């Protein structure tokens, strides 16, 4: 690095603690963060300020290292700065940072996706999962001529006004409107029901079916805990929706390319009309997309009348890092290995935890996702079934692990993730640390 370029780098944070930086941040940013859950408001305390990451490890401003099970809330399925993906990113930096034009990199990623997902006949890239959902729902309204959108209590689909109604973890415990500043007209056409109740869905469609443009659901709800749904329930609600001419949108921003190349749609054998993706498809860069039936995507401008655009959509870093990530995941056959490793890890963690505390915990896992929660007599499929005291109990577990260098997402309603970098030696190290840490509870 030349002296000239080094002058452009600001390192005013060096020598400061997380506590000091948080106080500075609160002066210039709302709550000191740029996404609410990062503030530690769900678990209490001061958020840790991280400055670097590699593999399964985060390093904070003081130089302390942590094994990371948050992984930027899901995108980093290969771990931080996977060497092969990093090589692609460095090469991209020498080519272009942004075009705002047609380019071949988005073509390659789109072809990769459509070649592996039969129902993804066309793809449109955007910059986030929220944008993907917003755009997909606009398409459903244009295609059906209907106004209403039907979602489920506890499923989070981004921070667009119409769907911030009984949403996910960052809103857990807040008012029923979920956010100030949302007009009544914005949510007037949003219908909401609890998960895991086919009869309620049937009754809703009997009265409103002809007005519902889209049924949107996370087929693996993972924003208010890990609420694994019955396949029978998912099959039935799709059947009901299709009977009434309602388009089915699967929000696979988290589960897409996390549960396998075809996501939950493939595992369930369900062909949704539209699917939204994000997180993993960008390889750690801000990317989202919506994909699905050719006739529906052809409604999007410039092919059709549905307008959607974005200055940084299909940015070369996200396209190339995303493609490299997916190619490596496919080449190394990571999914089955990660599924077994995740279940083994989560079960062992709970076994250690239950041996050190009078509270009984259990692990819920799916693919490479996990969720620690208070033990219940029945499967938890709805938010009203989450046991009382879970949030407070998780906060205690979170802080004792954080103190000992294990970083979970800072909310009892967020899920955890394993990456390809969480190999057997990393897991063994974490279990050894946790065994000692839980004695502090």
Curated annotation (Swiss-Prot):
UniProt EC number: 5.4.3.8
PROSITE patterns attached to this UniProt entry: AA_TRANSFER_CLASS_3
Keywords annotated in UniProt: Cytoplasm, Isomerase, Porphyrin biosynthesis, Pyridoxal phosphate
Domain of life where this protein originates: Bacteria
Family statement: Belongs to the class-III pyridoxal-phosphate-dependent aminotransferase family. HemL subfamily.
Protein name in UniProt: Glutamate-1-semialdehyde 2,1-aminomutase
UniProt-annotated location(s): Cytoplasm
Catalytic reaction annotation: (S)-4-amino-5-oxopentanoate = 5-aminolevulinate
Membrane-spanning segments: none
Cofactor(s) the protein needs: pyridoxal 5'-phosphate
Taxonomic classification: Bacteria, Pseudomonadati, Spirochaetota, Spirochaetia, Leptospirales
A GO cellular component annotation in the UniProt record: cytoplasm
GO molecular function list: glutamate-1-semialdehyde 2,1-aminomutase activity; pyridoxal phosphate binding; transaminase activity
Alphabetized Gene3D superfamilies for the sequence: Aspartate Aminotransferase, domain 1, Type I PLP-dependent aspartate aminotransferase-like (Major domain)
UniProt-listed InterPro entries: 4pyrrol_synth_GluAld_NH2Trfase, Aminotrans_3, Aminotrans_3_PPA_site, PyrdxlP-dep_Trfase, PyrdxlP-dep_Trfase_major, PyrdxlP-dep_Trfase_small
Name of a matching Pfam family: Aminotran_3
A biological process from GO: protoporphyrinogen IX biosynthetic process
Residues bearing PTM N6-(pyridoxal phosphate)lysine: 279
Subunit: Homodimer.
Pathway the protein takes part in: Porphyrin-containing compound metabolism; protoporphyrin-IX biosynthesis; 5-aminolevulinate from L-glutamyl-tRNA(Glu): step 2/2
């Amino acid at each position: 690095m030349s002296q000239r370029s080094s002058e452009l780098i600001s390192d005013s944070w060096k020598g400061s603690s997380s506590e000091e930086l948080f106080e500075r941040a609160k002066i210039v940013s709302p709550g000191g963060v740029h996404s609410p859950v990062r503030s530690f408001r769900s678990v209490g305390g001061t958020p840790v300020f991280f400055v670097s990451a590699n593999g399964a490890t985060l390093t904070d401003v003081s130089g302390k290292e942590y094994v990371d099970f948050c992984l930027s809330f899901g995108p980093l399925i290969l771990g931080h700065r996977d060497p092969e993906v990093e090589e692609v990113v460095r090469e991209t930096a020498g080519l272009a940072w942004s075009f705002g034009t047609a380019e071949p990199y988005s073509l390659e990623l789109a072809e990769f996706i459509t070649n592996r997902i039969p129902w993804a006949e066309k793809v449109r890239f955007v910059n986030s999962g929220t944008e993907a959902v917003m755009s997909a729902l606009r398409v459903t309204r244009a295609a059906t001529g209907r106004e209403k959108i039907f979602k489920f209590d506890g499923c989070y689909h981004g921070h667009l006004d119409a769907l911030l109604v009984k949403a996910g973890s960052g809103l857990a415990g807040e008012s029923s409107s979920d956010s100030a500043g949302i007009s009544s007209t914005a949510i007037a056409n949003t219908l909401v029901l609890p998960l895991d109740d086919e009869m309620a869905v049937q009754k809703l469609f009997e009265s409103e079916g002809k007005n519902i443009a889209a049924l949107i659901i996370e087929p693996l709800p993972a924003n208010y805990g890990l609420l694994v749904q019955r396949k029978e329930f998912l099959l039935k609600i799709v059947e009901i929706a299709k009977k009434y001419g309602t388009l089915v949108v699967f929000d696979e921003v988290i589960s897409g390319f996390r549960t396998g190349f075809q996501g939950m749609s493939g595992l369930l054998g369900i062909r949704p009309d539209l699917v939204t993706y994000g997180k993993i498809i960008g390889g750690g860069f801000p990317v989202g997309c919506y994909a699905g039936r050719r006739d529906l995507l052809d409604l999007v401008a410039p092919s059709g009348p549905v307008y959607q655009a974005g200055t940084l959509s299909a940015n070369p870093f996200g396209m190339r890092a995303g493609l490299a990530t997916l190619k490596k995941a496919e080449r190394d056959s990571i999914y089955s290995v990660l599924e077994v490793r995740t279940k083994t890890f989560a079960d062992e963690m709970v076994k250690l935890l239950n041996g050190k505390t009078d509270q009984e915990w259990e692990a819920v896992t799916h693919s490479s996702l996990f969720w620690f929660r208070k033990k219940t007599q029945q499967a938890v499929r709805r938010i009203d079934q989450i046991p009382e005291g879970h949030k407070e109990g998780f906060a205690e577990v979170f802080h004792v692990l954080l103190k000992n260098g294990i970083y979970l997402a800072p909310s009892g309603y967020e899920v955890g993730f394993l990456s390809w970098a969480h190999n057997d030696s990393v897991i063994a190290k974490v279990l050894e640390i946790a065994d000692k840490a839980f004695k502090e509870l």
